[in-house]
Amino acid sequence: MAFPSTKNNFIAQDFFPTVAKFKSTKQFFDCVIIDPPFFSTTPKGKVDLENDSARLINKVRPLINNGGTLIAINNALYVSGQEYMQTLEGLCKDGYLSIRELILVPDDFIGYNPIGKPITDPAPFNHSTKIAILDVRRK
C-alpha cells in the first residue's frame, strides 16, 4: 500500500465536526487512518476506546471509497488484543469491512524495555497499541 505523503494529503482536525462535514458534502477517501486518544470528551462528542471503539469506526466507514482502506488504531491499555479483535470481527460480520492485516509494533519503536507483564494480554497483537488494516466495501 503506497500513499503519497505530502502534507496536503493528510487532515488532522477535530473528529466529530470534520466527519459530519465530510458526510454532508459527500466527500470520500481512499484511505482513512483513525488514531484517536483513548479517551476524550468535548462539547462535540466523546471518544472512549476502552468501551466504544466500534462507534468511531462506524462513523468513518461511510467516508471510505469502495475498495478503500481503513487503518484502525486502538491504544487503550485496558483493552486486550482479543477484545479488540472481537470488536473488529463483529464489525466485519455485515461484509462491508474485512481484516486484511494486523500490524505489530516493531521492538525498536516501543521505546522502553518491558518490565513484568502488560496490564492486559495484547495477543494477537504484540503491544497495547493495536493496529489493524481493514478493507472497505460499499453498497
Each model region followed by its residue ranges:
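Short amphipathic alpha-helical segments
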Residues: 23-24, 44-47, 84-85
